[in-house]
Amino acid sequence: MKKKFVSTLLVLSVMSTCLLSACGSKPASESVDLTSVSLDTIEEKAKEEGTISSVGMPDDWANGKGSWESISNTYGLAHDDTDMTSAEELSMFDSEKDSPTKDIGDVGQAFGPTAIDMDVVQPYKASTWDSIPDWAKDPDGKWTISYLGTMGALVNKNNVSETIDSWEALKNSSAKITLGDVLRGASSQMAVLSCAYAMGGDAENLDPAFDYFKELASEGRIDVGDGSVERLNRGEIDVLATWDYLTLQYRDIVAENNPDLNMECHIMQDGAVQSGYCLVINKYAPHPYSAALTVEYLLSDEGQIERAEGYARPIREDVTLPDDLKAKMISDDEYTNTIPLADNDTVTKACTEIASRWEE
């Protein structure tokens, strides 16, 4: 659910414009000013609330289960989640503002500014704020990226003899590439954008990527099926382009379900964009202190390490991962030429163009 991107983002862009110009009714209750409250008070009030209700933060995404269990065990907060796309999360925040049920969400990087435009989020700066890169947070604290994904490749070595660690290597192989739903999938669109950079283009020049995929298509080397675990387990996919943490999760799942398959994970060395997911607190959150405490925990050393246990790389570079965990992840050496996507507007335009041109 978290991978759908452009079609719903376009809807939200229109929606946010309408909301800003319309004279809407006042919400049932004003939001708390979390920026003026001490951490001790937030923890005390959160324990009194006793509940945290999230959207788009499921157990099986970036070790969400481990994080929620720790939050529950540490602070006594009961948790429930409704999984949905980033656009749906923000739409729910707005549609429920008079009778809110959700406290916090996790949205794709490009949706952070959209959330502000829609005026459905409230600020909070965790105590680790200064260790978070400036590009990865709203200056006022209305969204904060908590973990990163980098474009990688999951390679079925039973099907592919070559080492696929770059778009050039893929092009020169006989392997088929699985991209998933390029019309609506964030990871799929980021794969195309990564290829553009690798082939000499960028977010404002996508032609090299489309030339690349046209050539692969002419050779019958684009697999139009999805990148599901079921297909991976059956050995139907040669190379799946997706976020690094998903390649590692899928590798582990396939190893358990079909030990005869040998899966290899790499970062695309000639073009690998890097993006993240933003924590956002509902402006109308029924449990605002619990939401702030959740943000605080997820950006703490413990919370960042737990994200890494789901193979998502922490946003905070000052967090030291345990050696046994680092050994399971893709080597740091493969991340030397990654491309952070700091300009959200440019990325949004690029994704819109990718979806439009891919359909052609």
Task: State each model region's role.
Residues 1-49, 360:
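Short, low-complexity disordered leader/linker segments with a strong preference
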Residues 31-39, 47-66, 277:
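Extracytoplasmic "Venus flytrap"
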Residues 41, 48-49, 312-360:
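An extracytoplasmic/periplasmic, membrane-proximal ligand-sensing/linker region
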Residues 50, 75, 97, 174, ...:
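Sec/Tat-exported extracytoplasmic proteins
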Residues 53-69, 80-94, 98-237:
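Extracytoplasmic ligand-binding site segments that recognize negatively charged/polar headgroups
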Residues 110-114, 239-260:
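A ligand-binding cleft/hinge motif common to bilobed small-molecule-binding domains
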Residues 121-130, 141-145, 168, 256-273, ...:
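Short beta-strand->loop
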Residues 272-273, 277-338:
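Mature extracytoplasmic/periplasmic domains
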